[in-house]
Amino acid sequence: MHTPFIVALDFPSKHDVQQFLRPFSGTPLFVKVGMELYYQEGPAIIAMFKEQGHAVFLDLKLHDIPNTVKQAMKGLARLGVDLVNVHAAGGRRMMEAAIEGLDAGTPSGAARPRCIAVTQLTSTDERMLHEELWISQPLEETVSHYAALAQASGMDGVVCSANEATLIKERCGASFLAVTPGIRFADDSVHDQVRVVTPRKARALGADYIVIGRSITRAADPLAAYSRLQHEWNGGETE
């Protein structure tokens, strides 16, 4: 895939996206399309990004019975996206079905979209895990278990906090992707995410791709913020 920086386009409409992308004209990005944008604009927004030369992570976090996920992935594969995801909590058979659907739906001669599994959302903390989700194991152990299950199910990697990337690499190997949201500059608000790190720390912890949204999309100068991201990832001292 392309750059290690995945820009989360959490906008409600195509118009808002176009306004944001204007300063990046001619610069191929790796963009994340989540539920908010995809449910409003549908497959047409994916086609627009691909025509502009951007890589696309379609972040719908599928979690359903295996056959439903298989058929959904079969359709998503035809869109030409580069990366999709499911919830690891859906279990091994569901994750295997996701890969089966992608294999069946990918056009002849095209590369199958990579598929990663969400371990635990970066808005989840130990209290929520135990008291609300009723999972007794510690957060790190739960993430590690889900990562191993995802790998055994044929996933290409996981979505995890950068704080768990080292643990996952040790258990699953260097080639197993760690895609890490919850990325903020040191002087940013953490908003609704509780497990956050800076770009430079994420790289040091073993992240392959970092997902960053509001720090770029809500910046007064998004292009300058993106340049700062590149600088910090490469060891710059602005943190």
Swiss-Prot record:
Q: Does the keyword Cell inner membrane apply?
A: no
State the reactions this protein catalyses.
Answer: orotidine 5'-phosphate + H(+) = UMP + CO2
List the EC numbers from the record. Answer: 4.1.1.23
The record describes its quaternary structure and partners as: Homodimer.
Q: Which UniProt keywords apply?
A: Decarboxylase, Lyase, Pyrimidine biosynthesis
- For substrate, which residues are the binding ones? 10, 32, 59-68, 122, 184, 193, 213-214
Q: Which SUPFAM superfamilies match?
A: Ribulose-phoshate binding barrel
GO terms of molecular function: orotidine-5'-phosphate decarboxylase activity
Q: Which family does it belong to?
A: Belongs to the OMP decarboxylase family. Type 1 subfamily.
Instruction: List, alphabetically, the InterPro entries matched.
Output: Aldolase_TIM (IPR013785), OMPdecase (IPR014732), OMPdecase_AS (IPR018089), OMPdecase_bac (IPR047596), OMPdeCOase_dom (IPR001754), RibuloseP-bd_barrel (IPR011060)
Q: Under which name does UniProt file this protein?
A: Orotidine 5'-phosphate decarboxylase
The UniProt function text for this chain reads: Catalyzes the decarboxylation of orotidine 5'-monophosphate (OMP) to uridine 5'-monophosphate (UMP).
Q: Which Pfam families match?
A: OMPdecase
Look up the record and name the pathway of this protein.
Pyrimidine metabolism; UMP biosynthesis via de novo pathway; UMP from orotate: step 2/2
- GO CC terms of this entry: cytosol
Q: Does the keyword Hydrolase apply?
A: no
GO BP = 'de novo' pyrimidine nucleobase biosynthetic process; 'de novo' UMP biosynthetic process
Q: Which domain of life is it from?
A: Bacteria
The record's active-site residues are K61 (proton donor)
